[in-house]
């Protein structure tokens, strides 16, 4: 049994105001975060992304690297459910595990996917979901009628995982009405399948508004750290200069307490800065112990 991923990114962006799936976060389009997460698991034989016809050439160009050679582009449909079906129709065989994920959820990560793979091995249908912890109100005409019992309430997310034969059977029964279902888990439930909950405790925000995109950008940015470093040494007569751990033979040498390896020092210094560890000189002081030491060691 092989794992196949379907990334659903064929929305028109009507509510968002543009194609949110190709919005850029840190020099990378939104949809690509999901593809990369699935690729990083090294557990998928094929990844199919459903996208609008207008974006096929754009996405094909963005995925031209060899890393994405097993990613297949599929023209989406008029609805989310139709887009999933279009992608599903491109899958051969009958014994695959199908992972369906929204491209608008770029915060999905390798660890969660790997956990889902393991959890779903013995299940026909699994949905990633988050338990509701906040108070929920039933509202009519902007008036709160009553507080809903949240004991058994969960927020359905993606990925959702199905045995291929499950989807084949539900499509046989419901193909003409799939547009009536908000996701494939609801479709499977209506056909009598038990959809097992796999609890997600990690952020998995779905981009619906500009504010969602802004929030996700902040969260992804918070995982990035930057450091700036520089190093230089005076030169004197000698028998060579150390650069990157290698000695370049010449009639000069770096004037330094250590070996004066400017390349290694210029790399270590920004790493210390990015990790808020201070300057390289704070860790390697001018002591007898450090005299003429190799910087790469």
Task: Locate each region found by the language model.
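N-terminal glycine-rich phosphate-binding loop and ensuing alpha1 helix
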Residues: 1-56
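Conserved N-terminal catalytic core of the sugar/cofactor nucleotidyltransferase
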Residues: 32-95, 175
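Conserved beta-loop-beta/alpha segment of the NTase-like Rossmann-fold superfamily
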Residues: 79-140, 157
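Active-site His/Glu-centered metal-binding helix of metallohydrolases
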Residues: 104, 263, 267, 271, ...
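Glycine- and Gly-Pro-enriched alpha-helical subdomains that act as flexible
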Residues: 120, 272-297
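Short, flexible, basic/aromatic active-site loop/helix in glycosyltransferases
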Residues: 137-160
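Conserved alpha/beta core of the MobA/IspD/sugar-nucleotide pyrophosphorylase nucleotidyltransferase superfamily
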Residues: 154-227
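Terminal domain-initiation and capping elements
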Residues: 223-232, 238-240, 245-246, 250-258, ...
């Amino acid at each position: 049994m092989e794992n196949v991923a379907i990334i659903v990114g064929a929305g028109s962006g009507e509510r968002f105001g543009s194609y949110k799936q190709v919005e850029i976060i840190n020099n990378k389009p939104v949809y690509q975060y999901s593809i990369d997460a699935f690729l990083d698991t090294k557990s998928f034989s094929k990844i199919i992304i459903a996208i609008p016809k207008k974006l096929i050439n754009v996405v094909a160009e963005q995925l031209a690297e060899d890393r994405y050679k097993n990613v297949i582009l599929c023209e989406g449909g008029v609805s989310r459910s139709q887009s999933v079906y279009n992608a599903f129709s491109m899958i051969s065989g009958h014994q695959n595990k199908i992972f369906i994920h929204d491209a608008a959820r770029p915060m999905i990560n390798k660890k969660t996917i790997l956990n889902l793979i393991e959890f779903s091995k013995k299940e026909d249908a699994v949905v990633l979901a988050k338990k509701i912890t906040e108070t929920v109100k039933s509202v009519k005409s902007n008036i709160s009628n009553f507080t809903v019992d949240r004991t058994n309430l969960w927020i359905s997310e993606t990925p959702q995982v199905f045995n291929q034969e499950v989807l084949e059977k539900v499509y046989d029964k419901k193909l003409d009405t799939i547009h009536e279902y908000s996701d494939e888990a609801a479709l499977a439930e209506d056909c009598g399948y038990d959809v097992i909950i796999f609890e997600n405790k990690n952020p998995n925000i779905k981009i619906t508004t500009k504010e969602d995109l802004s929030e996700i950008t902040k969260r992804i940015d918070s995982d990035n750290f930057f450091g700036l470093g520089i190093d230089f040494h005076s030169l004197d007569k000698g028998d060579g200069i150390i650069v990157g751990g290698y000695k370049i033979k010449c009639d000069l040498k770096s004037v330094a307490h250590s070996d004066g390896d400017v390349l290694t020092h210029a790399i270590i210094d920004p790493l210390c800065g990015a990790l808020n560890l201070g300057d390289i000189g704070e860790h390697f002081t001018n002591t007898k112990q450090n005299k003429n030491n190799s910087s790469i060691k």
